[in-house]
């Protein structure tokens, strides 16, 4: 397995290399980086251009690129960043930085026996970080999309990421900003929902404001979903694909029916149980 990479004390160097100025928490790096409202003056908020930032958005490339560069700089420095996805708001960090992984668990109050998913930018990247035992067409029919695919992990992943399981959940959100971010970052991102453990998931940045003081950067992509039905807070559908020829539903999530239909089109049979 890949060793953990150093990630402490790099923020100023990385920020300079990305063309960003380094300043105290809450300071503006440009006209688009805004001081967050009280009671969380330590948080920094960066709003994406346009209304929403999902697959249907037509972003202004200048502001879009600025947001990507700012997020990549923080992630490479070992920070935890709040991001919009196609299902919920999430917390992201470098999956190769053990200190950052620990910070995510502390911020959420999450048990370290619960796994973090890995977010990638392209289907081709899945083969680097997983031992894939399903047809490529199946992956492309499900990804990008509101699903987490659980497969056997490869030795490329940090040994401190979910050390209690040989499996890993893979996400490629159907969200333009997240795909661009993962590709620009150039490595696996650990991803989990932006909320305290056991509390409701978040569809806008205000709903996890209690976490802001513990985050380096908050990417505000606007509201996700309609916010009215309980189904919109279910998160991704989590599917175990670690057993050849079978699939197991770990979490029904928001796309159970369509996901199950695709799996069965490829001849996979339902099974029970998973160690992820």
UniProtKB/Swiss-Prot annotation:
Coiled-coil ranges from the UniProt annotation: none
Molecular function GO terms recorded: double-stranded RNA binding; L-threonylcarbamoyladenylate synthase; nucleotidyltransferase activity; tRNA binding
Principal location: cytoplasm
Gene Ontology process terms (BP): negative regulation of transport; regulation of translational fidelity; tRNA threonylcarbamoyladenosine modification
SUPFAM superfamilies on file: YrdC/RibB
Transit peptide stretch: 1-53
Pfam families, alphabetized: Sua5_yciO_yrdC
Entry membrane topology: Peripheral membrane protein
Name of the protein in question: Threonylcarbamoyl-AMP synthase
Organism: Bos taurus (Bovine)
């Amino acid at each position: 397995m890949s060793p953990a990479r150093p990630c402490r004390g790099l923020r100023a160097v990385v920020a300079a290399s990305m063309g960003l100025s380094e300043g105290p928490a809450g300071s503006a790096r440009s006209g688009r980086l805004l001081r967050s409202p009280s009671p969380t003056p330590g948080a920094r908020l960066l709003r994406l251009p346009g209304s929403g930032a999902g697959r249907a958005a037509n972003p202004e490339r200048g502001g879009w690129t600025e947001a990507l560069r700012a997020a990549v700089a923080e992630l490479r420095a070992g920070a935890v960043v709040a991001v919009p996805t196609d299902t919920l708001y999430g917390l992201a960090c470098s999956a190769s930085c053990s200190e950052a992984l620990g910070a995510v668990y502390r911020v959420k109050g999450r048990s370290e026996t619960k796994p973090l998913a890995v977010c990638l930018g392209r289907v081709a990247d899945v083969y680097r970080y997983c031992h894939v035992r399903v047809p490529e067409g199946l992956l492309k029919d499900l990804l990008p999309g509101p699903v987490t695919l659980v497969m056997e992990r490869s030795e490329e992943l940090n040994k401190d990421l979910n050390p209690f399981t040989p499996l890993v959940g893979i996400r490629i959100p159907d969200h333009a900003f997240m795909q661009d971010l993962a590709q620009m970052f150039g490595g696996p991102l650990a991803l989990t929902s932006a909320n305290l453990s056991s509390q409701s998931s978040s569809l806008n940045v205000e709903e996890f404001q209690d976490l802001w003081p513990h985050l380096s950067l908050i990417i505000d992509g606007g509201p996700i979903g309609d916010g009215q039905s309980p189904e919109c807070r279910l998160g991704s559908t989590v599917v175990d694909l670690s057993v050849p020829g079978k699939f197991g539903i770990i979490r029904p999530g928001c796309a159970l029916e369509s996901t199950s239909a695709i799996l069965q089109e490829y001849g996979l049979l339902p099974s029970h149980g998973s160690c992820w």
